[in-house]
Swiss-Prot record:
Species of the source: Saccharomyces cerevisiae (strain ATCC 204508 / S288c)
Binding positions for NAD(+) per the UniProt entry: 229-265
Protein name in the entry: Rotenone-insensitive NADH-ubiquinone oxidoreductase, mitochondrial
Subcellular location(s) per record: Mitochondrion inner membrane
Lineage: Eukaryota, Fungi, Dikarya, Ascomycota, Saccharomycotina
Cellular component aspect of the GO annotation: mitochondrial inner membrane; mitochondrial matrix; mitochondrion
Binding site for FAD: 55-85
Length: 513
């Protein structure tokens, strides 16, 4: 694990001369301006130990952050990463994890494994960024994570769990992603499970497993038994549909073998506010997906919005084609919330500090070169950037690849950093003057697993479509393409063997509970 390696070795050297370390901290007595969420009289400022090259600070460890790290030339920059999560998560397969189709450990890759492949200086801080301070070119970190404290009680940064510090940067890459959006609906946070991180997957498994055990002790026909065996998935996008499909696979393929009576009573509900599921696909594929879900006993609620969530039931309102609105109460034992994103607090805080971002809502507004509008040296990629593109992994990956190539070119232009930092307006013209091409997104299509070894897919590049269809063969195509998308050979091999194991054995659903 990255954190354990780093804490046991302050400096971890490899034959490729990569340096992965925690930077030392010194107190400079710098007065905090109070720009962050909390004001401190003095704050420790972490100075980069290598000043021979520009310092690039990456926030996050998701698709944008790790893809940028993979492609930037670390011989030209000193690169630092801040993230409370010490690993990259392959999010497209996260819906497969709660029921044990793939192991959670198979879809994560420690940051150190990416960093050690780079030449140059790579520094990782296992901490949460709470404030970006563009006036000082620093990022405030709230504390080291609990993992850091666990592995190194006497951490050499000299920070206590709640003590802040500031890290300096020359360039900042904001790639913190987004957090789930509950749209202000009461009860979602209290009673629902999100599906965005590994802990969410474990929580869903624990809840469903506990409900199965409780329901097994109740007589058939008991209303409480029916409630415990009711699963509601809110969100008809890829995450929600794939989560519902994976749950139904577990019920039909595994639970039916050792608890057949319970399996017959499990009811999965899929709730979607739009008139159709998977609306990013063409209509015939979305219709195929809906028919398949319903044929596998998943109850699909379309044009249905959740109005309120209570401990054991939710209130939903359905708007029919004739405009009539009806209300229904859906009892549930497990509620999965898989719809909507919103900006994280560190990003909404930055909205207030840059006048050009004051009206931003969904993410940081960026120009054609992914530079945050109103800033000289802050760039944003992925879900925390707003460029009119869908919040998908392929968008973040392409943005990161593009930006890393731009940074390599920037390093070759004399005085580029100096000229960029001195610009007061029309900042993007500097990129145009030096013949930088604007970012252009290449839509490669979309994939979605439906359950029962069926999937739908649209494969394209630009305006040319190579494949569109659904069914068993598309399921195998889905698997092949997902394997190819995994960023490390290690994770790719582990996922492949998880699928091989699934063909011969049941899922490891109750492991670690």
């Amino acid at each position: 694990m990255l954190s354990k390696n780093l804490y046991s070795n302050k400096r971890l050297l490899t034959s490729t001369n990569t340096l992965v370390r925690f930077a030392s901290t010194r107190s400079t007595g710098v007065e905090n301006s109070g720009a962050g969420p909390t004001s401190f009289k003095t704050m420790k400022v972490i100075d980069p130990q290598h000043s021979d090259k520009p310092n690039v600070l990456i926030l996050g460890s998701g698709w944008g952050a790790i893809s940028f790290l993979k492609h930037i030339d670390t011989k030209k920059y000193n690169v630092s990463i801040i993230s409370p999560r010490s690993y990259f998560l392959f999010t497209p397969l996260l819906p497969s994890a709660p029921v044990g189709t793939v192991d959670e450990k198979s879809i994560i890759e420690p940051i150190v494994n990416f960093a050690l492949k780079k030449k140059g200086n790579v520094t990782y801080y296992e901490a949460e960024a709470t404030s970006i301070n563009p006036d000082r070119n620093t990022v405030t970190i709230k504390s080291l994570s609990a993992v850091s404290q666990l592995y190194q009680p006497e951490n050499h940064l000299g920070l206590h769990q709640a003590e802040p510090a500031e890290i300096k940067y020359d360039y900042l890459i904001s790639a913190v992603g987004a957090e789930p959006n509950t749209f202000g609906i009461p009860g979602v946070t209290d009673y629902g499970h999100f599906l965005k991180e590994i802990p969410n997957s474990l929580e869903i498994r624990r809840t469903f497993a506990a409900n199965l055990e409780k329901a097994n002790l109740l007589p058939k026909g008991d209303p409480e038994r029916r409630r415990l065996l009711s699963i509601v998935v809110v969100g008809g996008g890829p995450t929600g549909v794939e989560a519902a499909g994976e749950l139904q696979d577990y019920v039909h393929q595994d639970l039916r073998k050792f608890l057949p009576a319970l399996a017959e009573e499990v009811q999965i509900h899929l709730v979607e506010a739009l008139p159709i599921v998977l609306n990013m696909f063409e209509k015939k594929l979305s219709s195929y997906a809906q028919s398949h879900l319903e044929n596998t006993s998943i109850k699909v609620h379309l044009r249905t919005a959740v109005a309120k969530v209570e401990e054991k039931q939710l209130l939903a309102k359905t708007k029919h084609e004739d405009g009539k609105i009806t209300e229904e109460t859906i009892p549930y034992g497990t509620l999965i919330w898989a719809t909507g994103n919103k900006a994280r607090p560190v990003i909404t805080d930055l909205f207030k500090k840059i006048p050009e971002q004051n009206s931003s809502k969904r993410g940081l507004a960026v120009n054609d070169f992914l530079q945050v509008k109103g800033s000289n040296n802050i760039f944003a990629i992925g879900d925390n950037a707003f460029a009119g593109l869908p919040p998908t992994a392929q968008v973040a990956h392409q943005e990161a690849e593009y930006l890393a190539k731009n940074f390599d070119k920037m390093a070759q232009i004399p005085n580029f950093q100096k000229n960029l930092s001195s610009r007061k307006d029309k900042i993007d013209l500097l990129f145009e003057e030096n013949n930088f091409k604007p970012f252009k997104y290449n839509d490669l299509g979309a994939l979605a697993y439906l359950g029962s070894e069926r999937a739908i897919a649209t494969i394209r590049s630009g305006k040319r479509t190579f494949y569109t269809g659904g069914g068993l063969m598309t399921f195998y195509l889905w698997r092949i393409l997902y394997l190819s998308m995994i960023l490390s050979a290690r994770s790719r091999l582990k996922v492949f063997f998880d699928w091989i194991k699934l063909a011969f054995f049941k899922r490891d659903f109750f492991k670690g509970l």
